[in-house]
């Protein structure tokens, strides 16, 4: 575990995010939960101000933070404030919770690339914030779409989606 790194991302309902991100090369483990809100020990029914988020443990020898962020921006709409699909509210906001200054720098650079690319019709509204405590969600929410493959999701990879760096745009 000592060679692994951690990322925390929020981009709508955590079920769909986890289902897609856990399958990415280099991802060692994922868990869904709540972060960025007002109360300790939040629950699905009581998480004021918290975002539904995913904590990702990854192997930097197999993938990097930038690659995770590029996939994150491909599978959710970062241009809708507090909404993904039918899910509306601050729980479903787009937010990157960075664990160190390097992640913050990479997040801001990636957002600038997404904005410059024109791949999305609007400007990115994804917030970038220091990672507060991550509270693991209840067991029934972990790996939800693995247990219920026909369950609800509003996340999907967009075919042919490739994020160019600003210099390439």
Swiss-Prot record:
EC main group: oxidoreductase
Keywords of the record: Oxidoreductase
Molecular function terms, GO-annotated: L-methionine:thioredoxin-disulfide S-oxidoreductase activity; peptide-methionine (S)-S-oxide reductase activity
Residues making up the signal peptide according to the UniProt record: none
EC number: 1.8.4.11
Active-site residues (renumbered): 13
Gene3D superfamilies: Peptide methionine sulphoxide reductase MsrA
Family: Belongs to the MsrA Met sulfoxide reductase family.
NCBIfam families noted in UniProt: msrA (TIGR00401)
Function, as annotated: Has an important function as a repair enzyme for proteins that have been inactivated by oxidation. Catalyzes the reversible oxidation-reduction of methionine sulfoxide in proteins to methionine.
Protein name: Peptide methionine sulfoxide reductase MsrA
Gene source species: Mycolicibacterium vanbaalenii (strain DSM 7251 / JCM 13017 / BCRC 16820 / KCTC 9966 / NRRL B-24157 / PYR-1) (Mycobacterium vanbaalenii)
Organism lineage: Bacteria, Bacillati, Actinomycetota, Actinomycetes, Mycobacteriales
């Amino acid at each position: 575990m000592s060679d692994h790194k951690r990322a925390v991302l929020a981009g709508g309902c955590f079920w769909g995010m986890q289902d897609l991100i856990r399958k990415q090369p280099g991802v060692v483990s994922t868990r869904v939960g709540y972060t960025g809100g007002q109360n300790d020990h939040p629950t699905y029914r009581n998480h004021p101000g918290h975002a539904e988020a995913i904590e990702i443990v990854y192997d930097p020898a197999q993938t990097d933070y930038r690659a995770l962020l590029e996939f994150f921006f491909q599978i959710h709409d970062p241009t809708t404030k507090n909404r993904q699909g039918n899910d509306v509210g601050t729980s479903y906001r787009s937010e990157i919770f960075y664990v160190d200054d390097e992640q913050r720098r990479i997040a801001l650079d990636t957002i600038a690339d997404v904005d410059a690319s024109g791949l999305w019709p609007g400007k990115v509204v994804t917030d970038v914030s220091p990672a507060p405590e991550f509270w693991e969600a209840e067991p029934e929410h972990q790996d939800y779409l693995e247990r219920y493959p026909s369950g609800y999701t509003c996340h999907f990879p967009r075919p042919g989606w490739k994020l160019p760096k600003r210099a390439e745009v």
